[in-house]
Each structure stands twice: as C-alpha cells, then as structure tokens.
C-alpha cells in the first residue's frame, strides 16, 4: 500500500487540503495586513487632518494678526491726518476770527483817520479864516489910522 504511486496519490489527495489550509492562512494574513493598512491609513489621515486643521487655524491667527497690524499701521496714518485736519480747521477758525478783528480795527482806524483829516481840514479852514480876519483887521486899522491922520 505504500507504493510510490499510492504515496503520490495520497499526497495528491492531501495537497488540496494543505493548499486550502495554506490559502486560508494566507488569506487571514492578507486580511490582517489589509486591515492593518486600512487602520494605518485611517490613523495617518486623521493625523494629517488634525495637522491640516492646526495649520489652518494657525494661518488664520497669523492672517488676523497681520490684518490687525496693517489696520493699525494704516489707521495710524489716517488718525494722524485726521488730527492734522482738525488742527488746521481750528487754525482756520482762529485766523478767520483774527481777520474779522483786524477788519474791525482797520475800519476804526479809517474812521479815526477820516476824523483827523476832517479836523485838520477844519483847522486849515480856521487858519485861513484867521488870516483873512487878520488881513481885514489890518486893512481896517490902516483905514482908521488914515482917517485919524487926515483929521489931525
């Protein structure tokens, strides 16, 4: 019964059983390897997603910080311009008040100057009248002297 033919036949009959056992072991190993790969992939995807989320949040924080700094820089210039504009407007109002005061003073000086001119003119007129009166008085005096000399 243990002839080479019977052994090979027996082996042939056992081969499919061994192959089946081997293929089950291989499939279990393959299945566990695939499960391991899936688990590793899931873990790495989760880590990558977390890292991406952290990076995204950090980028948002940095962008917000940059935007705040830019706003502060721009607002600093705008604020300075606004302060300067208010200062200029205040100076304009003060200058307008000063110009109005000087205008009133100029009008007063013109009125005083006109009054002085009128007074000087009147003095000049009075001086002329006095000279005329003096001349007339001299004429009258001379006429009276002549009359008085003629009577003597």
From Swiss-Prot:
Record's keyword terms, sorted: Cytoplasm, Endosome
Cellular component GO terms held in the UniProt record: BLOC-1 complex; endosome
Major location (coarse): cytoplasm
GO biological process: endosomal transport; late endosome to vacuole transport; root development
Location relative to the cell: Cytoplasm; Endosome
Description of the deletion phenotype: Longer primary roots and more lateral roots in the RNAi mutant.
PANTHER family the record matches: BIOGENESIS OF LYSOSOME-RELATED ORGANELLES COMPLEX 1 SUBUNIT 1, BLOC-1 COMPLEX SUBUNIT 1
The protein's assembly and partners: Component of the biogenesis of lysosome-related organelles complex-1 (BLOC-1). Interacts with BLOS2 and SNX1.
Function, as annotated: Component of the biogenesis of lysosome-related organelles complex-1 (BLOC-1), a complex that mediates the vacuolar degradative transport via the intracellular vesicle trafficking from the endosome to the vacuole. Probably regulates the PIN1 and PIN2 homeostasis through its interaction with SNX1.
Stated family: Belongs to the BLOC1S1 family.
Name of the featured protein: Biogenesis of lysosome-related organelles complex 1 subunit 1
Species name: Arabidopsis thaliana (Mouse-ear cress)
Protein's gene: BLOS1
């Amino acid at each position: 019964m243990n002839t080479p033919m019977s052994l090979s036949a027996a082996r042939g009959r056992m081969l499919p059983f061994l192959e089946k056992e081997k293929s089950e072991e291989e499939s279990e190993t393959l299945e566990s390897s695939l499960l391991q790969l899936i688990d590793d992939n899931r873990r790495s995807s989760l880590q990558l997603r977390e890292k991406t989320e952290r990076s995204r949040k950090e980028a948002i924080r940095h962008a917000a910080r940059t935007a705040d700094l830019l706003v502060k820089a721009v607002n600093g210039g705008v604020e300075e311009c606004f302060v300067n504009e208010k200062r200029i407007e205040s100076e304009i109002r003060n200058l307008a008040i000063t110009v109005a005061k000087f205008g009133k003073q100029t009008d007063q000086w013109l009125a005083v100057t006109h009054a002085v001119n009128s007074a000087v003119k009147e003095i000049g007129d009075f001086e002329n009248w006095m000279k005329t009166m003096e001349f007339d008085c001299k004429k009258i005096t001379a006429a009276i002297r002549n009359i008085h000399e003629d009577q003597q």
